[in-house]
Amino acid sequence: MSAETSTTPAPAENTNGTPDNAPAPEVTAVEAPATTSQPHSASLYVGELDPSVTEAMLYELFSSIGQVASIRVCRDAVTRRSLGYAYVNYNDTAHGERALDELNYTLIKGKPCRIMWSQRDPALRKTGQGNVFIKNLDSAIDNKALHDTFAAFGNILSCKVAQDEFGVSKGYGFVHYETAEAANNAIKHVNGMLLNDKKVFVGHHISKKDRQSKFEEMKANFTNIYIKNIDPEVEDEEFRKLFEKFGEITSATLSRDSEGKSRGFGFVNFSTHESAQAAVEEMNDKEVRSQKLYVGRAQKKHEREEELRKQYEAARMEKASKYQGVNLYVKNLTDDVDDDKLRELFGPYGTITSAKVMRDTAPVETATPESETKESANKENEKAAEGEKEPAAEEKEKEEKKEAEQKPEKKPLGKSKGFGFVCFSSPDEASKAVTEMNQRMVNGKPLYVALAQRKDVRRSQLEASIQARNNIRQQQAAAAAGMGQAYMAPAVFYGPGQQGFIPGAQRGGMFPPQPGMMMGMPGRPGQYPGPFPGQQGGRGVGPNQQIPPNFQGLPMGAMQGPGIPNGMGYPMVQGQFGGGRGRGQVPGMGGPMRGGYGGGRGGVPLGGQMRPGQGGRGQAVGQPGPETPVGVLTAQALSAAPPQQQKQMLGEALYPKIQATQPELAGKITGMLLEMDNTELLGLLEDDEALRAKVDEALSVYDEYMKNKSDEPAAEKPKEAAQEAPAEENKA
């Protein structure tokens, strides 16, 4: 391959080699000498990758050609799932050319990769010059076979066969040539040829925008009409005579099944659009043999599906807007609250259009009647076998009719799920109900009342909160390693000797953090993210550090990593507090840390009470101070605390309950639940069933997130594991 190859525009990355714009008439104006536009670093686009392919796998493959500058697998910003393509940068352009020649269509994880030059200029990427469209391809033809077929007509920049989600060919593909002359030559020689015994069509690629405008023009000048609700007795000749009066007919046919019977619909194609339009206007809704006909423009299947999809979306949006701000979600209901009781509770606040308590679908009480019905049916069958067939059959039919009539009236009610919905006639009434009924005690339980949300909206909010915390962990890790955020945002793999870092290692030759090790986190006002940064020589807390007053209430499980035995969690913090000269009292740090640094678990002490700083001025850190009272967290106690302290108090109360059922993920789940309102969290503390339901919902979201994240490089996992517990559980 010549050096001139890299100067040509490549297709847009997001179209995977299928640019949308129409082809340019000539290519001579774009071509330039290789010496003027040749980049110093050769960048390759690698597509058609399996989602599990990582930077390390690509480095192992592409480093066999030459020295790799960097590799980046592009991932979704939220889920971090691979988008199926990557960029490989060489320092030497010759290495890029060699990789393009030797590694194109190489199997990676069982899938052939597709390599082409990367073109950052979107204007050059989307010119569409030299792009050829091929359809009616045999399913056995893949990217490599298509490339080998069309390579004889010129230099190919990109070649792709369209596939569905299962990797099966859709029967069409694209070949992007370097020049328009090569594309014209391929169209001239291959169009109409047989490939694997199938005649293929080859032509210039037309952009979607141009195709859409052409399609709209065809719709406005239609000649083919569709007729349905035709009587099955109507014959072809009679069907044709119905429409002959409107103009010249080129074809008219009735659709029939395999036995030759009419299926009740047909098509008529006129020679002019005016004739077809007149037939639609006059024959639509006209009765023929006592059946009202439907006559309209003939549509393709994909067009009908698109219209149905738009109608469904419009109906869904209309329904969502109709109930926006008027539908309330009510939970923490007792089992004795039914639909009527729920309507009675919310009736004073406005006109209620519907009120429903959600219940289990399979009540236990119905098991006995069903078994009795089966036994009686068996007895009737036995009697029928003895000669009482007709009376038994009549009685059985009567009983079935009675049961069918009674079912709508006596629908069995299952056990209440503890929540329901109330829909008002106006948003003002709904807002008033939320204000008055939220946290109101009903049958000894505080209600939670809020505007109802769809399940997908709630799930997206949880996923967004998970992603936000993941970004915070990355930023904290970058700050701890002495790097800016720009190094952590894109996951880039750098080759040996290149600028940057290898995943799992940090700058300055530091080893990656191991699970159980405590990492320094950047301090922010009102937060205590990790070991106190800014402390030097054990001189106590720096002047700009702020520690929540009730920090001593953090559970030990949230502070101790899997690699640290009980009683030895974070000795560095002890040293910073116990040694050196203390600079006055730290608010809320007096006395032993209950469940935190002050004492270990399992009978292993952490050294008891913190020793005061020797030679320090003012009150020592280890002297007794005010503590948060031990007991059940109440709404009054929560409201009395400062706003920045309320979440931590809730986290301290939630963590032991969650740890009892999910000890490994207690910190993560607690952090996820703390995104909820404080009033709702208070309800969870009092209702174990509701708490379990929320924990299960958070687990399902977290499991799905981890599945999507399972394709990340293995080298990054130890580093991430070391950061997960401190970042998530300190927040609790």
UniProtKB/Swiss-Prot annotation:
Gene Ontology BP terms: mRNA processing; mRNA transport; regulation of translation
Output compositional bias ranges, type Basic and acidic residues. 371-412
Where is this chain primarily localised? cytoplasm
Residue limits of the RRM domain?
42-120, 130-207, 223-300, 326-454
- Record protein name field: Polyadenylate-binding protein, cytoplasmic and nuclear
Q: Annotated region Disordered: where?
A: 1-26, 357-413, 706-732
Top-rank taxon:
Eukaryota
Q: Which residues form the PABC domain?
A: 630-707
What SMART domains does UniProt report for this protein, alphabetically?
PolyA, RRM
Q: Which GO terms describe its cellular component?
A: cytoplasmic stress granule; cytosol; nucleus; ribonucleoprotein complex
Q: Which molecular function term from Gene Ontology is one that the record holds?
A: poly(A) binding
Task performed by this protein: Binds the poly(A) tail of mRNA. Appears to be an important mediator of the multiple roles of the poly(A) tail in mRNA biogenesis, stability and translation. In the nucleus, involved in both mRNA cleavage and polyadenylation. Is also required for efficient mRNA export to the cytoplasm. Acts in concert with a poly(A)-specific nuclease (PAN) to affect poly(A) tail shortening, which may occur concomitantly with either nucleocytoplasmic mRNA transport or translational initiation.
**Which PANTHER family does its entry note?**
RNA BINDING PROTEIN (PTHR24012)
Cross-referenced NCBIfam families: PABP-1234
Q: Which family does it belong to?
A: Belongs to the polyadenylate-binding protein type-1 family.
Its lineage reads: Eukaryota, Fungi, Dikarya, Ascomycota, Pezizomycotina
Question: Any idea which UniProt keywords this protein has?
Answer: Cytoplasm, mRNA processing, mRNA transport, Nucleus, Repeat, RNA-binding, Translation regulation, Transport
| Regulation: induction | Constitutively expressed throughout the vegetative cell cycle.
Which Pfam family is an annotated match for this chain, by its short name? MLLE
Where found? Cytoplasm; Nucleus
Instruction: Name the species this protein comes from.
Output: Emericella nidulans (strain FGSC A4 / ATCC 38163 / CBS 112.46 / NRRL 194 / M139) (Aspergillus nidulans)
Compositional bias of kind Polar residues: 1-19
